């Protein structure tokens, strides 16, 4: 059962990663490519903020 769930999850994620936007939204493709990295910027911002206040 677990093997089936893992395989199913992999298939869904691989389809999600490889899918293309509809032609009407092709203009936003570069923005969509960058969107998964945005949370990393917030994580790094926390370190910059703490460095600015001397890691109190």
Swiss-Prot record:
Q: Which domain of life is it from?
A: Eukaryota
Primary location class: plastid
Positions of the pro-segment in this chain: 1-19
GO cellular component: a single term: chloroplast thylakoid membrane
Q: Does the keyword Methyltransferase apply?
A: no
Localization recorded for this chain is:
Plastid, Chloroplast thylakoid membrane
All disulfide bonds of the chain are none
Q: Which protein family is it in?
A: Belongs to the PsbK family.
Quaternary data:
PSII is composed of 1 copy each of membrane proteins PsbA, PsbB, PsbC, PsbD, PsbE, PsbF, PsbH, PsbI, PsbJ, PsbK, PsbL, PsbM, PsbT, PsbX, PsbY, PsbZ, Psb30/Ycf12, at least 3 peripheral proteins of the oxygen-evolving complex and a large number of cofactors. It forms dimeric complexes.
Name-wise, this protein is Photosystem II reaction center protein K
Q: Say which species the protein is native to.
A: Welwitschia mirabilis (Tree tumbo)
Taxonomy of origin reads: Eukaryota, Viridiplantae, Streptophyta, Embryophyta, Tracheophyta
